[in-house]
Amino acid sequence: MEQQKIPQATAKRLPLYYRFIQNLSLSGKQRVSSAELSEAVKVDSATIRRDFSYFGALGKKGYGYNVNYLLSFFRETLDQDDITRVALIGVGNLGTAFLHYNFTKNNNTKIEMAFDISEEKVGTEIGGIPVYHLDELEERLSSDIQVAILTVPATVAQSVADRLAETNVHGILNFTPARLNVSDNIRIHHIDLAVELQTLVYFLKNYPQ
């Protein structure tokens, strides 16, 4: 996907398209129009056509898109056959939920290990995932783990990120309110659930449908 040099906004929508196309394929549907895609994923059809245009001719005018072809294309584009191994740091309520879920709908993403400081959790398995002490972070993180999920208290998020920067981790999904400072070779996606909720409430009050 990096080699395509597509806009980041488009890249963020690709997994959404892929998930819907997977469902279409499972239902036996052979083709789909941009209008049908638009209705399903709540992205306007012009944006979908523009997103798809970055990859060449994925469909035919008047016919739409071949579902099996799209499925194969996005599977390759999103590296669905390559497993991305993930570490989770912080086994609180949210972290525990992630361990039980473990992205079962994503064939190419899997949490391999978790870290915490709680004596009750260290040395156990949650959702089949081993939980190690945070002191063992650098020792336990193998070279093939390149993504980390942070669900630690905000007060320690930066120090954990600093330690991750010394490993082979190149991507951090940050669920803490802290805004982290890391080197340019590490990509961070911030997901602040409180901010998202406040934004939703604001839109409900000020932009009623």
UniProtKB/Swiss-Prot annotation:
Annotated DNA-binding ranges come to 16-55
Residues where NAD(+) binds = 90-95
Molecular function terms from GO: DNA binding; DNA-binding transcription factor activity
Which Pfam families does the annotation name? CoA_binding (PF02629), Put_DNA-bind_N (PF06971)
Tell me which UniProt keywords the record has, alphabetically. Answer: Cytoplasm, DNA-binding, NAD, Repressor, Transcription, Transcription regulation
Q: Is RNA-binding among this UniProt entry's keywords?
A: no
Per UniProt, subcellular location reads as: Cytoplasm
Any one GO cellular component localisation term in the record = cytoplasm
The record's InterPro entries line, in alphabetical order, gives: CoA-bd, NAD(P)-bd_dom_sf, Rex_DNA-bd_C_dom, Tscrpt_rep_Rex, WH-like_DNA-bd_sf, WH_DNA-bd_sf
Describe the function of this protein.
Modulates transcription in response to changes in cellular NADH/NAD(+) redox state.
Return the similarity comment: Belongs to the transcriptional regulatory Rex family.
Tell me the protein's name: Redox-sensing transcriptional repressor Rex
Please name the source species: Bacillus cereus (strain Q1)
